[in-house]
Every structure is written in C-alpha cells, then in structure tokens.
Amino acid sequence: MGGARRLKLDGSIPNQLARAADAAVALERNGFDGGWTAEASHDPFLPLLLAAEHTSRLELGTNIAVAFARNPMIVANVGWDLQTYSKGRLILGLGTQIRPHIEKRFSMPWGHPARRMREFVAALRAIWLAWQDGTKLCFEGEFYTHKIMTPMFTPEPQPYPVPRVFIAAVGEAMTEMCGEVADGHLGHPMVSKRYLTEVSVPALLRGLARSGRDRSAFEVSCEVMVATGADDAELAAACTATRKQIAFYGSTPAYRKVLEQHGWGDLHPELHRLSKLGEWEAMGGLIDDEMLGAFAVVGPVDTIAGALRNRCEGVVDRVLPIFMAASQECINAALQDFRR
C-alpha cells in the first residue's frame, strides 16, 4: 500500500516545554522528516509552537490530540494558528481515547465514536473553509453545531493549505472512516504487520475508494516498538521492557481484536485479570518470543534499520520507532543506519 514512496522517519518531541525546542532542532538537524507530540500528562499543542519557532523543515504533528476532550471550534483555532506559524508544516493527529477517560477524566460525552469522529473532521473543515474563503458557516450535525462566525472572531486567511488531519484507528469501522475522510492514518504500536496488511490496509482502501481519492494523497504512519541493545544483557533488558508493554496493551479491550488476528484472543482475559491485580511482571512473562516478534522489531543494533524497513516498506509511509529501554548511543546508531 505504501507504493514506491521513500519511507519517512519520524521522532518524538517531548511535551515538557523546556525540552521541546532542543529536541525538535535535533530531529531536523539529524535528517528526520517529522516530529510528534502525544497527549498524556501535558498539552500536545504547546510544544509544537516552540518546535515551529526553532525549525524550518520538520513536519510537526500531534500523535494524538484527544478530539473528544475538545470541540471542533477549539481544535480548528489552535490548528489554524499552528499551521500559520509553522508555515504549513502541521499535521493534526486526532484520536478518540476510550470511554472512561472521556467521561470520567475529561467530563465530556461519549457515544458512536466513528460517527462522532467523522463529524468532528467535517466540522473542522467547514470552519476552516469559512475562515479561508469567507463561506457562511452553517454546520449542523448529530453531535456538533457551528452556525455563528462574525468578523470579530474570524482569523485572517493564510497562504498555506488547511492543516492535514490524521486519525488514529485500530478497529475496522474507525479505520475505514479514516480512509474516507482523513489525510492520513496513525497506527498504534500494538498493531502487527499482519494486522496492518490483513485488516487496516483493506479498510483504508475501502474508505479511500468510497471518497474517490487517490492513494498518493494519503499517508499511513505507524509507531513501532524496538528492542535492541549494545550487548546481550542490554538486549535482554529491552526485550523484558517490551514484553511488559505488549502485555499492558494486550490487557486493554481495544486491542483484543489484534490478538485475535493471530489466534491469541484467549490471552486477553488473563492479561486483563492480572492487570486488575497489578501483576505486571507476571503479565510480561506471558508474552512469548513469537508474540514479541509480531509486535516489535527485535535484535542487535546493526540489524534494526533493515528490520524496520522490512516491516514497514510497502505497507506504511512513515515510521516512528519507539525504543524500549535502549541507551541513547544504541538509538543513535540504529537511526543513523536507517537514514543512510
């Protein structure tokens, strides 16, 4: 599905504001194509402002910003300003989060996530169109309504295209909707190459076909866990950390279908049970070598670049490696090989 495109290499921008600018500068200096923030314990947008200020080429994105914690007007505003300030380099990556977080952490409504996300993106684009072309804003949907936009609240038109919108998706319905309405897809680390090729890619292609769009206008991005080390001890430690991370993801109902695709569906209830008991060590012990290899790139440092390419080329367009418990020296060496 990735065709003959050059595989883009992306990196992470820390959400701590004091570190964001230096990290973005380092990514650009070292030849990375994009830098991404995540929404966890800090806001995902503020670091991108600093990154935009200190770089000129690096694509800048959120992976992800929680859409349902906000409304389309709020996201349209911050996306518009970041797109203008970065001179057209923003990728607005949106995700749904899960019901407990939306309702109990953000105190926002939940329901029909694929339909709601589709409408969220449509509302964003209606707002941006009103700002850019002066089109009357008259968006009324099932979940969102935006009908007032007076000159006082209308930002200036900009010389750049509206921000690209990527959607995080794992399930078929959300992935197909992503292919239909978004500019790109954000893949989760708990997605194997088999799941990508057998489930995600066909769903994306169905969505693209329904929208009548060409594949060349769409990007597929994926985070990939990497377990490596300078020696056997470091590699073993990285593998242990990666097994724990896979087990944590596998305990979450959202990723049960990924396990089922490999015939490992029975593992989910046990991981879920152990997670409720806080038995994290025991959970990691249930992830065997076959499972580890399905969800992560594993091996000595000098094998990582080739393994990443083998996993991603022809399937995805850009990769964000997530190194588990690796030294910075190992990370630098592996990524230097990748960029050659």
From Swiss-Prot:
MF annotations from Gene Ontology: oxidoreductase activity, acting on paired donors, with incorporation or reduction of molecular oxygen
Keywords, sorted A to Z: Signal
Pfam families given in the database record: Bac_luciferase (PF00296)
Transmembrane segments: none
Signal sequence extent: 1-20
Gene3D superfamilies xref list: Luciferase-like domain
Note: Was identified as a high-confidence drug target.
Name this protein carries in UniProt: Uncharacterized protein Rv1360
Species this protein is from: Mycobacterium tuberculosis (strain ATCC 25618 / H37Rv)
Lineage, opening ranks: Bacteria, Bacillati, Actinomycetota, Actinomycetes, Mycobacteriales
